[in-house]
Every structure is written in structure tokens, then in C-alpha cells.
């Protein structure tokens, strides 16, 4: 079945998936608030971050959410975590959720500590869980645009919704694996960004691959421990939504979070690094939310805590590294 898809958010990630869905034969209408971006996409048929990509004719664009939703059989969102609530509130003002809503962003809302899926349920109500889906996994936008092989997971509460979303996204090169642990999928995608900042700091100090692999492995342990206490399945974090996404984000030259950490090690302040990158660095905000939740539940997360203290308590990076290296070694548990 071919879908008519409203795609909310036309940043690099949103555009890459909208392009993939259109190339998979679906009619896609991309929505963004920025009128100049929509004008460029519509008239020049180019995305400013990917001018080399040919936009298929069945991918159109609008700055009117009502127009994007007209006739839609599926909604996909690709906005930042900070933009999630206002976009969903706008969506709620137009329609009740009666078709699948696929969340593709990764993060935890500041102040509330809610996952993006939990924001959706708060806005649309618990019955909307039937239509909720979550896509996550190792998926760098530029590689998705090039059609490189990629494996991700799709999670949903309702089996029929899961099947519909799975069929919409699956292509010969975009491998989609079902996973029923939606909360675990969401947490893996959010928390890995914090570990990626730590790995970027390691890169900036040229600590080498051994140190980075140690951070990834111990970081995965932190993510698994956090997710398990939150009621998720530990094996979810061993898969694409956890380990897979963590590896890609920490080792990719295209990762904003890793680049951000590297800039911190090179002497930039967090604000300077964010300005230089020029795009949202989700790990900065997730570090705060994750630290608050971990503190409340008494979860020991030394890497996450270290990143939080560097970003929000002005901890000297060298001192933070020394504190990590001086911790007692105990049973690995992995």
C-alpha cells in the first residue's frame, strides 16, 4: 500500500527521510515553518544542506500544516526535541490522531523529563498510543540521502500500526527491524548523544581508539542501566537502537554531538561550540534531563554526570577526566 505522508520538519534529517519515502513510491508533503526554506525547496527543488540531491516529483512542500495533512494516511515528524511540543500542539489544534504518527527525533524534553513519545501521549491522550510509532537506529542523514545501506528499528504499541509503518519505510537498502519496546528504542536514541559528547572530548585530546572504545562500552552500560530501571528491555539497548546508534554517533565524522565534544576539548565554550556548529546539538539538552532523572532514581552514571558537570557546572574538562579515571574499578556487569 502506498501512503500519503505528511512530514513535519525539513531539516537535514527530516529531508533525508522524506526523500527516502518519496523514492519508495509514497506521496509526501514536507512541512516547515520557515517560508524561505519552503520557497527554495519548492521553486529551486534543492535543500540548502544537500543541493546535490535531486528531489523526486512526488515530494512537495508547504508551510501550511493544514495543507500538509490534507488526505494524509500517515504523519512523520522530524523536528528537534525542543520543537516537538509546539509542533504537536499545532497538530492537535488541527486534528485528533486517527492515523499513524511516527516520531524520528531523539531526545528528552527539558524540565519535564518526558520522552518525545510521552509528550505525544500527553497532548493527544492515552488512546493515541494505538497510532504512535518510533523510528531510531544508526542513520546518518547524509548516508541515507546517498542510498547507502542502513539498518534501523521501528517500534509501536499496536501491531497493525507497526506493520503499516514498517512497510512504508522498508526499502532494499533501508532495512527496518520491528521492536515492541518503544520506550527502550526512544531512550537509546536520546542517551547516546551524551556519550557521544564524551567521545568527542576524547577525540579532542587525542586519547586514541582504546579510550574511545572504553567510553562507548561503559557508556552503553550506563544507558542499559538507566533504561532497565525505567522499565525497558535490556536487550533493546544491545541492538540497533542502543549499541548500533551509539557506535555510529560516537565514531562518525558527521556527528554533531561528537564534534561538539571535540570543540570543547579544543577550548571552545559550550555556547561557542553550538554557534560554530550552527545546528541543534541534542546531547547538550539530554545531558541535563538525564542527569536530573538519574539523580532522582539514584542511578550511577559517571560519564553522563561528567558531561553534565562540564556543561552546566563549569567543571574543568581535565579535572572531569581525572575524576573518571580515578574511580574504583568493579565488576563489569556487561
From Swiss-Prot:
InterPro entries, per database record: 6-PGluconate_DH-like_C_sf, 6PGD_dom2, G3P_DH_NAD-dep, G3P_DH_NAD-dep_C, G3P_DH_NAD-dep_N, NAD(P)-bd_dom_sf
EC number, as in UniProt: 1.1.1.94
PROSITE patterns in UniProt: NAD_G3PDH
Primary localization: cytoplasm
GO biological process: carbohydrate metabolic process; glycerol-3-phosphate biosynthetic process; glycerol-3-phosphate catabolic process; glycerophospholipid metabolic process; phospholipid biosynthetic process
GO molecular function, one term: NAD binding
GO cellular component: cytosol
Residues noted as binding NADPH in the record, renumbered to the chain: 13, 33, 106, 141, 256, 280, 282
Catalytic activity: sn-glycerol 3-phosphate + NAD(+) = dihydroxyacetone phosphate + NADH + H(+); sn-glycerol 3-phosphate + NADP(+) = dihydroxyacetone phosphate + NADPH + H(+)
UniProt enzyme class: oxidoreductase
Signal peptide: none
Binding annotation for sn-glycerol 3-phosphate: 106, 137, 139, 192, 245, 255-257
Source species, domain of life: Bacteria
NCBIfam families in UniProt: PRK00094.1-2, PRK00094.1-4
Protein name per UniProt: Glycerol-3-phosphate dehydrogenase [NAD(P)+]
Organism annotation: Chlamydia muridarum (strain MoPn / Nigg)
Lineage: Bacteria, Pseudomonadati, Chlamydiota, Chlamydiia, Chlamydiales
Amino acid at each position: 500500500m502506498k501512503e500519503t505522508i505528511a512530514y513535519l520538519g525539513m531539516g537535514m534529517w527530516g529531508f533525508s527521510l522524506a526523500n527516502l519515502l518519496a523514492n519508495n513510491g509514497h506521496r509526501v508533503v514536507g512541512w516547515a515553518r520557515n517560508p524561505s526554506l519552503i520557497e527554495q525547496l519548492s521553486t529551486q527543488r534543492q535543500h540548502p544542506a544537500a543541493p546535490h540531491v535531486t528531489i523526486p516529483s512526488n515530494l512537495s512542500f508547504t508551510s501550511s500544516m493544514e495543507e500538509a495533512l490534507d488526505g494524509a494516511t500517515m504523519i512523520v515528524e522530524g523536528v528537534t526535541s525542543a520543537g516537538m511540543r509546539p509542533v504537536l500542539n499545532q497538530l492537535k489544534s488541527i486534528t485528533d490522531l486517527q492515523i499513524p504518527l511516527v516520531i524520528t527525533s531523539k531526545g528528552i524534553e527539558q524540565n519535564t523529563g518526558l520522552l518525545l513519545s510521552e509528550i505525544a501521549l500527553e497532548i493527544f491522550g492515552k488512546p493515541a498510543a494505538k497510532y504512535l510509532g518510533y523510528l531510531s537506529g544508526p542513520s546518518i542523514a547524509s548516508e541515507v540521502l546517498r542510498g547507502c545501506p542502513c539498518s534501523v528499528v521501528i517500534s509501536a504499541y499496536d501491531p497493525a500500526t507497526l506493520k503499516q509503518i514498517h512497510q512504508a519505510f522498508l526499502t532494499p537498502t533501508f532495512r527496518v527491524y520491528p521492536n515492541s519496546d518503544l520506550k527502550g528504542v526512544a531512550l537509546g536514541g536520546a542517551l547516546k548523544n551524551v556519550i557521544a559528547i564524551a567521545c568527542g572530548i576524547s577525540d579532542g585530546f587525542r586519547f586514541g581508539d582504546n579510550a574511545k572504545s572504553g567510553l562507548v562500552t561503559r557508556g552503553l552500560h550506563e544507558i542499559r542501566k538507566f533504561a532497565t530501571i525505567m522499565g525497558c528491555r535490556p536487550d533493546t539497548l544491545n541492538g540497533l537502537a542502543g549499541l548500533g546508534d551509539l557506535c555510529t554517533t560516537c565514531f562518525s565524522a558527521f556527528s554533531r554531538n561528537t564534534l561538539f565534544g571535540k570543540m570543547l576539548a579544543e577550548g571552545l565554550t559550550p555556547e561557542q561550540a553550538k554557534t560554530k556548529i550552527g545546528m541543534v546539538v541534542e546531547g547538550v539538552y539530554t545531558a541535563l534531563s538525564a542527569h536530573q532523572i538519574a539523580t532522582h532514581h539514584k542511578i550511577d552514571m559517571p560519564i553522563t554526570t561528567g558531561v553534565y558537570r562540564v556543561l552546566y557546572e563549569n567543571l574543568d574538562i581535565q579535572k572531569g577526566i581525572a575524576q573518571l579515571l580515578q574511580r574504583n574499578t568493579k565488576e563489569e556487569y556487561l
